[in-house]
């Protein structure tokens, strides 16, 4: 069996590494570089990848594709894709399934299909170095990638001829690269990963015990649409706006000129990491009736920092949230690891240092650490790397919709994966023969405010009073973060399950919106949850009281029966409203009105010659509402 290679499939650059003895080694590509631009160009005769594709981008802008990772697993209508459409020189189009694809020379190409070209280049680079075929890989993704994006990455690997043995989060991979072989007994590190198109922050605990190293992710967060490309776009906009002021020409309408500006902006941004100012000089950038136009603009580091300070600030806000989720203070962080090329920017380093009160480590290569960590994980899976245990987490809570439109969480966010969690639910109606399991992801109490991942029916439930059937719902998340959900009737043994498909994954805007909404609406969520609990309690008491009236029969006099039924009607009317105090008051009124019913029941029981046995409580059964959804076939 061959080696399992580690691939950092980046937005701007990609990198491949492999275990060489007891250490991971980054492999140089055919051009002699340790990283490869994640750029793909389609010409009349061939497909170019990496530096050759980048070199011809100016003359072939519409067919030269870059930053495809920003489209992978995304819907065409999403805010991020619509924003990218305005600035990308190539054509982003809507696929039949609603995903964002790319139109090249009249052909619609899926992002996994395009990304596969980069993976093929990484595969070939490794094969040339090893002198043997490579069929297995560990591929990294941003920690905040959702199910759709993870599955799309696995698909890209499959298209490239690779069996993806594991999807690993980029900050976790960087931690592996940093901590492998460390002799420190216990340390907590923060991995700040600002790459070409994505941002992640993870708090990771590294333990050494009895010769075994454990890497445990305590919490993770980020933004899958924030990275160096966004920094570049700020510089591009500035250059274009300045040129328009001077010359009255908008270069956004000229794809070839726009590509030249893009390359110059990226170069200027990089130069300003070591210089205080740089000159952007693009002769013959365009022409009009008066003749050729030349672009010459001086950009200072101070100007660059002013253009992007809000982007850096948003990343610092994520740091605060993730530290809180991890239950750690700034003082408890032993080391800060910076990953991703954009972390070379002095402003980024300064703001991170200010937040943590200490400088980040300088001995970790931000371009190579992720690929090295992926190779280490490949070595772990292969058995070449011993005594290393990696414990990653799921970034968002998972659950199902239950009675009253509440999301009942089975797996909390930042739960270690792989994981499996089961909980028993029941029916909402008497003699209900089917239930629909509605799978949700998010942080809100109100089911409709979360993302629907899918739903499925469990049919053939034996007729029984409501609350009697026991439906066991199980969530199973594998080590790649891919979700399976099953439901089983414990009485009949009948089972149904669903694998959450890529087409129903979350977009990162929805993830971030869920978290923001959860924080902004925490009080509203609490009140809603209390209202639903009051409604559910009212419904249960009304249902039980009606049954007791039937059982009491003639033992209950007509006046008392009328009063109780009126109290039930009042309670049911109140339960349809949004006034919790009113529901509570009507619940108490029904309990008081039902006192004669209890006396009648006791009298009837004594006449029957013994006490009525108490109903057995359904311990561990959650009162849940399932509705049967009929398929229109």
Curated annotation (Swiss-Prot):
Keyword Nucleotide-binding: yes
Region (Disordered): 599-633
Name of the protein this chain belongs to: Chaperone protein DnaK
Gene coding for it: dnaK
Sequence positions bearing Phosphothreonine: 198
Record SUPFAM superfamilies: Actin-like ATPase domain (SSF53067), Heat shock protein 70kD (HSP70), C-terminal subdomain (SSF100934), Heat shock protein 70kD (HSP70), peptide-binding domain (SSF100920)
Keyword Nucleotide-binding applies: yes
Pfam families per the UniProt record, alphabetical: HSP70
CDD domains xrefs: ASKHA_NBD_HSP70_DnaK-like (cd10234)
Main function: Acts as a chaperone.
Induction: By stress conditions e.g. heat shock.
UniProt-recorded Gene Ontology molecular function terms: ATP binding; ATP-dependent protein folding chaperone; unfolded protein binding
Family statement drawn from the similarity comment of this UniProt entry: Belongs to the heat shock protein 70 family.
Source species, domain of life: Bacteria
Organism from which the protein derives: Actinobacillus pleuropneumoniae serotype 3 (strain JL03)
Keywords: ATP-binding, Chaperone, Nucleotide-binding, Phosphoprotein, Stress response
Biased composition (Low complexity): 599-613
Family annotation (Gene3D superfamilies): 1.20.1270.10, 3.30.420.40, Actin, Chain A, domain 4 (3.90.640.10), Substrate Binding Domain Of DNAk, Chain A, domain 1 (2.60.34.10)
